[in-house]
């Protein structure tokens, strides 16, 4: 009683103040005494202690009805009312939490923001007399799979397991219609925690279980595993959230009805070569993914996990280790290709020989790869220059696919370069594709801003100091800009850019190559010449370039390399002669 008197004194209230008045005055007085507001810290501590004791006392208060000493006559025409003392349900929850602190795992008492907004299980608390009526109304209005009714210290607890997720506010507002005087409180139970909560409730002293229609032997359905989605995105190296969403939703269908799983094993034509192995493992998790509302957000988080993995590799691995790991992945793809159909091997060998016709100087390719690995400052860019349709982009795209990196367009206005350059974050190399500038005489080429923009990116080209790169919705990253290749038609090459280039490679028209490529339409349609497997195989079959590849890597894939050389040697003379005549190799 003394603590209550002191509390009302601090709150400037009479001793007879109601619980609602005390709570309202507490919020107002707390602002007055709060240290951050210039108040008294000691009084604030005292006020919080007294208020906590008051809440505990309110939670222990029992329901009472007070009878009038001089009741009205039975037929006086006036209605009679009971003075009902309503216990503070938050206090009851506080006492319940105090008895069993581990129940905080299953639902939140004070911080409703931490609750799931649409759980499928709810905990209701009301009076024992109101419970039967309220339960009947709930069964009429909601689809209910099961329930549990328990009595504890004068109140009734109802655990509802609904057929579909329902907002906490929806259940609470429905119950309030029938609980105008009786206490009523609704709490959402976290997903897949209903059985654990019930077991915890049964251990509370003084709790009596009245009804139970929930099967306690049924194991909770497995929850969607975010980690599986993230690992899958990293596995397929997907940095497009919408593409990942579409791919993962298709894994939800049964494997026996999946068109991809029914296809013959052809890793060249199938975009996701690991689909047959991934589908059974992810099918259940993907079916749960279909019922999640924020699918795009989860896929964006998975894409962030892919970018984070790249950032980790960039920070912890040397460039030589990164390229060696990439070669290992491409060699596995070559092994699967050589184990495939003969028709696919024929096209693969044709692509290798066509690449040899387009760019026979393998030493330049080796020098480019070594420069990409060493990444020396100043002179670390290669310029591919030549007329239109001479194979500049084909060779550059093959190198980019083998090393991995980003293709950048710098022909726009300078204000558009900021986020374009941000695509180079954590990349191994970059390709400045089809850079425009001032046309050379008699070329009839359009002019552009590309050369001017590159000239203004001297720190990026030199790689001597870190530069700030930025992606949308991400913080700036300071890093050494990656090395790369510049492709251009016959534009005037500024001296300042040429001074920062390692080599200028000139391309010319090769009529026989163009004719052979047109006649071998299957190679053209599958874009096999720009595939990383084609370029690496080209390096492996040339003796002068094979020795530049790591010896331990060649020893690890010795059988694959020998099989590759056998397939090429078996077809070389026939295919090479027909290609140099501009004919299709299959005729």
From Swiss-Prot:
Which SUPFAM superfamilies does its entry note?
Chaperone J-domain, Origin of replication-binding domain, RBD-like, P-loop containing nucleoside triphosphate hydrolases
Q: Where is the SF3 helicase domain?
A: 360-520
Q: Name one GO cellular component term.
A: host cell nucleus
Origin superkingdom: Viruses
Its subcellular locations are: Host nucleus
What does the entry list as the binding residues for ATP?
A: 386-393
Q: What is its EC number?
A: 5.6.2.4
According to the record's subunit comment, the protein's assembly and interactions are: Forms homohexamers in the presence of ATP. Interacts with host HDAC1. Interacts (via LXCXE domain) with host RB1; the interaction induces the aberrant dissociation of RB1-E2F1 complex thereby disrupting RB1's activity. Interacts (via LXCXE domain) with host pRB-related proteins RBL1 and RBL2. Interacts (via C-terminus) with host TOP1 and POLA1 allowing DNA replication. Interacts with host TP53, inhibiting TP53 binding to DNA. Interacts with host preinitiation complex components TBP, TFIIA and TFIID to regulate transcription initiation.
Q: What does this protein do?
A: Isoform large T antigen is a key early protein essential for both driving viral replication and inducing cellular transformation. Plays a role in viral genome replication by driving entry of quiescent cells into the cell cycle and by autoregulating the synthesis of viral early mRNA. Displays highly oncogenic activities by corrupting the host cellular checkpoint mechanisms that guard cell division and the transcription, replication, and repair of DNA. Participates in the modulation of cellular gene expression preceeding viral DNA replication.
Q: What is the protein named?
A: Large T antigen
